């Protein structure tokens, strides 16, 4: 059995820890069979090949939640780079949870997502759901609550460009530097942006979605980890982007616009000017996990 789980853009614009969407590339792929012990083999990026692997953590978590004994032999094709801002740990965690669910015959969304979040917490120190949830559902997702699980979904299908520089931004550090309180004016601005962005998504107005890619809650404090952001953001807009923003906690950047190849090239060249190579993905939003 084999499951493919996509990369995700979390913290989409003003929706810190709430908005997220799956994208077509890159992705993680997990093959698995029942076994008499836990085993995991990894191809691609370097991640643990023992019980610390988040796919194993999540699969075990689901078995524990339902009181079942389970052992799997897994082979993980790891194409989403860790610490990329593209939901790497969330994708592997969800893959593990879905594998366990398939073997155990579990179809409960809440249980599967709860198990996947156990893997996410093991990796990042926080059980935030804005990678796991959109990867699971495949739509643009709005997390009202994780416990109980309440998710609002907006079907989307629009092209975008993602640029991934050869820089790492550790998720734990990116969360640690956030303040416990923000100014009232910033909170009000984010509410306004979030409401308008949801309206634009429901009407398919991608140009307005791009214009609303702004945040006052998290990004201002994370810029110390991404001093290059203003440079690449300007390069994207100068190349015709409707808007550009950080994916997750970075360093990946995504942008919306008409000529995505030109926009991606401009962002990559802006990184190259500071001595950093970058990969460019022309892909689509609105992709979820699926069985192969």
UniProtKB/Swiss-Prot annotation:
GO molecular function (one): ATP binding
Catalytically driven reaction(s): L-homoserine + ATP = O-phospho-L-homoserine + ADP + H(+)
Pathway: Amino-acid biosynthesis; L-threonine biosynthesis; L-threonine from L-aspartate: step 4/5
Highest taxon listed in the record's lineage: Archaea
EC number of this enzyme: 2.7.1.39
Enzyme class, UniProt record, top EC level: transferase
Alphabetical list of Gene3D superfamilies matching this protein: 3.30.230.10, GHMP kinase, C-terminal domain
Binding-site residues, ATP: 81-91
Subcellular localization, as worded in the UniProt entry: Cytoplasm
Family assignment from sequence similarity: Belongs to the GHMP kinase family. Homoserine kinase subfamily.
Name of this protein: Homoserine kinase
Lineage: Archaea, Methanobacteriati, Methanobacteriota, Thermococci, Thermococcales
Gene label: thrB
